[in-house]
């Protein structure tokens, strides 16, 4: 006569197996050739690192260094304050990066809340003082931009002062001629617009051929 099993004394690593059930294999079966199962043989050959004879095939890990070889701001080593790889722009590069800013020690038992805030304030002020911030270098960088893109700075330095806002800089060429529509105001602002109208504007034409223009637009 079989003894009765006390479930309270059965170890936790025991488990019950139902003899009436059968094991169901996982689908897809990882023991199969999944590349062939899903029809990826052609793609796998295109990206294979080695050929069937063992020779090198496609190089997947392409280096980015050749792509940035001509860039003046490239870094082979990520610059930090500690390694000094930032060059002349190091102080500007790190000034507003929280991960690279000098973090004051955490508030301890001997530091009051006011002392902690004062320490943070001194850290932020130091970001804009030498040697953390080089104003001469910033001025030099801006002057280089001005020499490289003179048209972008043309309206900023006329006569040693900032030029007034010119509404014609935002005007649209509605008639498509490249000239200002008002003949009286074309003396000083006779420059052609960069983007000419395609003729689809519904503005009222001011030229003598206005009727033909309207007919053409209606047909379109």
UniProtKB/Swiss-Prot annotation:
Subcellular location: Nucleus
GO biological process: one example: negative regulation of transcription by RNA polymerase II
Keyword check for Transcription regulation: yes
Pfam family, one: Rox3
Any one cellular-component term (Gene Ontology): core mediator complex
Feature: compositional bias, Low complexity: 178-189
Record-level Gene Ontology MF annotations: transcription coactivator activity; transcription coregulator activity
Record region (Disordered): 171-220
Predominant location: nucleus
Entry keywords, A to Z: Activator, Nucleus, Transcription, Transcription regulation
Residue spans of biased composition, Basic and acidic residues class: 208-220
Signal peptide as annotated in the record: none
Function statement: Component of the Mediator complex, a coactivator involved in the regulated transcription of nearly all RNA polymerase II-dependent genes. Mediator functions as a bridge to convey information from gene-specific regulatory proteins to the basal RNA polymerase II transcription machinery. The Mediator complex, having a compact conformation in its free form, is recruited to promoters by direct interactions with regulatory proteins and serves for the assembly of a functional preinitiation complex with RNA polymerase II and the general transcription factors.
Subunit annotation: Component of the Mediator complex, which is composed of at least 21 subunits that form three structurally distinct submodules. The Mediator head module contains MED6, MED8, MED11, SRB4/MED17, SRB5/MED18, ROX3/MED19, SRB2/MED20 and SRB6/MED22, the middle module contains MED1, MED4, NUT1/MED5, MED7, CSE2/MED9, NUT2/MED10, SRB7/MED21 and SOH1/MED31, and the tail module contains MED2, PGD1/MED3, RGR1/MED14, GAL11/MED15 and SIN4/MED16. The head and the middle modules interact directly with RNA polymerase II, whereas the elongated tail module interacts with gene-specific regulatory proteins.
Annotated family: Belongs to the Mediator complex subunit 19 family.
PANTHER family: MEDIATOR OF RNA POLYMERASE II TRANSCRIPTION SUBUNIT 19 (PTHR28270:SF1)
Note in the entry: Present with 6116 molecules/cell in log phase SD medium.
Protein name (database record): Mediator of RNA polymerase II transcription subunit 19
Organism in which the protein naturally occurs: Saccharomyces cerevisiae (strain ATCC 204508 / S288c) (Baker's yeast)
High-level lineage: Eukaryota, Fungi, Dikarya, Ascomycota, Saccharomycotina
Encoding gene, per UniProt annotation: ROX3
